[in-house]
Amino acid sequence: MTSKSSPLIFERSREGRYAYSLPISDIKTNSVESLLDDKFIRKNKAEFPEVAELDLVRHYTELSNKNFGVDNGFYPLGSCTMKYNPKINEKVARIPGFSESHPLQDEDQVQGSLEIIYSLQEELKEITGMDEVTLQPAAGAHGEWTALMIFKAYHENNGEGHRDEVIVPDSAHGTNPASASFAGFKSVTVKSNERGEVDIDDLKRVVNENTAAIMLTNPNTLGIFEKNIMEIREIVHNAGGLLYYDGANLNAIMDKVRPGDMGFDAVHLNLHKTFTGPHGGGGPGSGPVGVVKELASYLPKPMVIKDGDKFKYDNDIKNSIGRVKPFYGNFGIYLRAYTYIRTMGATGLKEVSEAAVLNANYIKARLSEHFEIPYKQYCKHEFVLSGVRQKEFGVRTLDMAKRLLDFGVHPPTIYFPLNVEEGMMIEPTETESKETLDYFIDTLISIAEEAKNDPDKVLEAPYTTVIDRLDEATAARKPILKFENLKQEK
């Protein structure tokens, strides 16, 4: 591995350099020792980097220029919906009345903010077909866990606390079984059939008196619509279980079909994906949860309600599982999502899904002669191809993903779902042009040709990135996670 990386900010540090200039204080101060118990006081000086303001600005500007995001390149990361985030969202989120408000202000002083929360709840109820919505959860997995805790409370309140199993398809997101475990449930896997859909016979086998719920994404992670969803609903409901909708793939079906109409009892949405909150850098996200009326009394509190002409917090929720996020969640993402929904309207959201599905099927059709496509039917917003043909020449999907970096394209999701060998999951979203799609397709085809005729060229990629081929085995076995460890290595 060679590196053209920048020095760490700690390596730029020089004792005595400061990025600030403050006058000497004329206010009497007390010593730390007089204010805090000794157990709370550091014994050694904190090792903060000492750099001048110019060095600080240059350092982070240099790093920002090495970043990759949807604003500077194609980002077909499957199941992540890396669509363009309209800049009007940012303008609205920066309106001082919103950006300078505080969650501890009196309700009378933040009526505009509360109205946004209430209005977004109403919009999401309409989009999902749910009866009530909470915006509190901070991200998708947090929304999953919140919904499962609601299910748990519901079953316990009905004298069925023994229901401790959650059914998860073998193509599911990894967060599904993780959320189930975190909520105190056992995960039970249901197999996919030859079409990539839930195997109905296997579902009948695993459903029993201990079934609390099934977690489904529809379309599923293979990009395939579960056409037997109504039969799945009947099987699970007849067994006393509930249906949970993972909203990761809602971008494919807006204004086409709603989770509530498919029989789901709860749903989470990813505002940072479907509704254009910027994501990919670790947050903030937002994972609202919607439920049918039978579960509404279990939602986290407080809720925001409309009382006459005013908006207020409602803490009088009979069976509430309690608060799941400080204050009321990530408000800045609500502003961006609400702006997007109001800008697009119902017709616009429908066109979003139609374009997302069209783009995915266009790429799939053009690549089908060059890669193995395990599921031949039309896909929705994403699809999974397999690199097994290229593997015959010693080139794996991982190698092709690294080669894509040399062409200014972020690699798709690879080796997921787990039930496709050498899988590559591609989600172009609706915001990309045909020219961009063609560039990506032609690039992948050229890489497939390289794999056949010059495999070493692919195996040694990437060539143009700051860090080239990583020694991933050593990185996994001997991770260097802090500056102190780096100094020891050097």
Swiss-Prot record:
Enzyme class: oxidoreductase
Gene from which this protein is expressed: gcvPB
Name under which the protein is recorded: Probable glycine dehydrogenase (decarboxylating) subunit 2
Cofactor: pyridoxal 5'-phosphate
UniProt family annotation: Belongs to the GcvP family. C-terminal subunit subfamily.
GO molecular function, one term: glycine binding
Entry EC no(s): 1.4.4.2
Catalysis performed (reactions): N(6)-[(R)-lipoyl]-L-lysyl-[glycine-cleavage complex H protein] + glycine + H(+) = N(6)-[(R)-S(8)-aminomethyldihydrolipoyl]-L-lysyl-[glycine-cleavage complex H protein] + CO2
Residues with the N6-(pyridoxal phosphate)lysine modification: K273
Domain of life where this protein originates: Bacteria
